A protein has these predicted regions:
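Negatively charged, low-complexity tracts enriched in Asp/Glu with abundant Ser/Thr
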Residues: 1-49, 69, 73-74
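Intrinsically disordered, low-complexity regulatory segments enriched in Ser/Thr/Pro
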Residues: 47-93, 97
Length: 97
């Protein structure tokens, strides 16, 4: 049984799955059509994404900063948490990876 947060996150990821190329390597990276290497913030209240340098996903009451783009173009993991692991799973599932 999915929680409301899990359901809404998966729904949001499905909205952008067709427009994004995901690369699950040592560094998490992707290119968005028309805006390469852009990160997104998912706003649960407005059910939409906002472009940002840092990917922030709001889970429960806190915001977890999962990845940050470095000047070299690589990505740095800012935290390895159970929430981050769940996020990876949702993204992979939503993007059929």
């Amino acid at each position: 049984m999915k929680t409301k947060t899990e359901y809404r996150m998966e729904k949001g990821l499905h909205k952008i799955a067709e427009k994004i190329y995901w690369n699950f390597g040592d560094n998490f990276g992707y290119a968005f059509q028309g805006a390469p290497l852009t990160m997104f913030v998912y706003d649960f209240d407005k059910d939409t994404f906002h472009e940002k340098e840092v990917l922030k996903i709001r889970l429960w009451q806190d915001k977890y900063h999962i990845f940050k783009r470095l000047p070299t173009g690589n990505y740095k993991t800012l935290g390895a948490t159970a929430e981050a692991d769940k996020l990876y799973s949702y993204i992979k599932k939503a993007c059929n990876v």
